[in-house]
Amino acid sequence: MALSFVSSTRFSKMQYGIWHSGSFTQRVSVRCCEIANEAPRPKSKLQVGSPIIIVEAPKVIKTAASMPCLRANSGLVKPGDVGRIVSRKPKDLWAVRLSIGTYLLDGKYFKALELDEGDSD
């Protein structure tokens, strides 16, 4: 998706019953349009309910409770821990349910867990 900007200048002595002193107002219109040669963005594998695995231990962790608590990570969340995404927050912040509780984690600390759907023959 591309954005195009169009600038227009208006000069009017009387607008909405108010006399202006001859100054002009700058207005900008923004239009969104699809461009055919633009490659589609890949959809994230992460969504609510997706299993994840911690790849790097965060230095501080924040609980996802109604009254959140920020504390130093003293070995509570370790690389290799597995959990599920409960919800998504703005700016790549995710509420993740781990075995020790639900925490708000940045997306750089975990990745989607690839589950093998193998045949049981």
From Swiss-Prot:
Phenotype of gene-disrupted mutants: Specifically defective in the accumulation of subcomplex A, a stroma-protruding arm of the chloroplast NADH dehydrogenase-like complex (NDH).
GO biological process assignments: NADH dehydrogenase complex (plastoquinone) assembly
UniProt-listed Pfam families: CRR42-like
Subcellular location: Plastid, Chloroplast; Plastid, Chloroplast stroma
GO cellular component: chloroplast stroma; plastid
InterPro entries noted in UniProt: CRR42-like (IPR021495)
Primary residence: plastid
Keywords: Chloroplast, Plastid, Transit peptide
Function: Required for both formation and activity of the chloroplast NAD(P)H dehydrogenase (NDH) complex of the photosynthetic electron transport chain. Functions in assembly or stabilization of the NDH complex; probably involved, together with CRR1 and CRR6, in the incorporation of NdhJ, NdhM, NdhK and NdhI into the NDH subcomplex A assembly intermediate (NAI500) to produce the complex NAI400.
Subunit structure: Biogenesis factor component of the plastidial NDH subcomplex A.
The protein, known as: Protein CHLORORESPIRATORY REDUCTION 42, chloroplastic
UniProt organism field: Arabidopsis thaliana
Gene giving rise to this polypeptide: CRR42
